[in-house]
Amino acid sequence: MHNADCNWKNIMQSFTESPNDFSILHQECSSGLNIPINNIFTDTENNTHLLLDQTVTHNQNGTANILGKIYKVTNGYMFSQGDITSTNGANFLGLNQCTEEAAISVLQNYHSYKETLIPRASFINTLAETLNHLGLYLDNISPMEIGKYILDQFGKTYDEPTTEKSNNDTNCHEYSNSYYYVVALGTLALGSILGYTAKYVWDNYNGKNIKNENIELVRENKQLKFSTLLYENFKNNAFILDEIIKINNLNDIIKLAKSMQEFKSSISSLTNLNNEIIKLNSPSAIALNLASVSKILHEICDNLKGNDSFTTINNFAKLITMIRTENPDSEEYKASIKEILEIFSSHYEEIEELNYATPLLAIEAYSPLEIIE
């Protein structure tokens, strides 16, 4: 590292214009600062990953090197960071002129490759734990201090600049190369491609004071906001949420509906309702959908063709419980089935009597004429 040959002036200018672009460290350092990280990739779930290899290289002859293999691409091929899904992946990678088998193969390889990438969150956590082990903390340490610490471990000394740094940019060129070297070294040690690290570097250089108290206050405010939202949702909807958790899902009811030819038109409505119920059918599910609880409850009541009330959901929960627990020959079971069908069948006709002699799961063995008398 101590033999690094870098153009610090260009690096400084680049960080000023593009604080998140760390490719400048590769371009302006001929040795010593090369790290095996090429880019940042954001996948379809909006998770950020560190790319350890250059996965796609566009060649001038109309081909592209994708994960080490050459593929023919369209003339208008362009590669940029973004989403790659199974549906738009071939177009995104420029594989339109490949055979279908080749396109599918490269997409599968690319998805497999993404599974090996380092999640940014895990990288930050590992970095924080490593620094804490050294007695340093990510939220109040500067790249300058990290850089000097590393130099100290190598037995190298750092000469402090003789000119005192002011709170403006008027004397920004009065620092020696060693200053920028230590800053860059500290930046790389902190995980140089992380955007917030670049901000630490440049804020430190410009004499700005990153207040740990402010960072902590923001964290506390977010925790308080979440706790308040959690409390209000459970306080206002506790009884309703209990009913949703009791229902859990409608998989068994949907299976019954599929076995009854006359009521297959209700399957779509039941499925839509099931999708909403699943969002709130456990404490963890509620927490994940906390900000949308009211909207989801409205959708559930709307699917049940009732008012936004506890009564609407409670009545439905009772019907589901009855179907799941009563004997198929009982009047309660038969009545519950009819009520469910009345809610969800778009062309439901009054049925005087169903043949309940056989359990509902076995009804698919009969024709509609045998079921309805």
UniProtKB/Swiss-Prot annotation:
Intracellular or extracellular location(s): Membrane
TM stretches of this protein: 180-202
Keywords assigned by UniProt, alphabetized: Membrane, Transmembrane, Transmembrane helix
Presence of the UniProt keyword Transmembrane in the record: yes
Any one of the GO CC terms: membrane
Tree of life domain: Bacteria
Membrane topology field: Single-pass membrane protein
Name this polypeptide is given: Uncharacterized protein RP760
Lineage of origin: Bacteria, Pseudomonadati, Pseudomonadota, Alphaproteobacteria, Rickettsiales
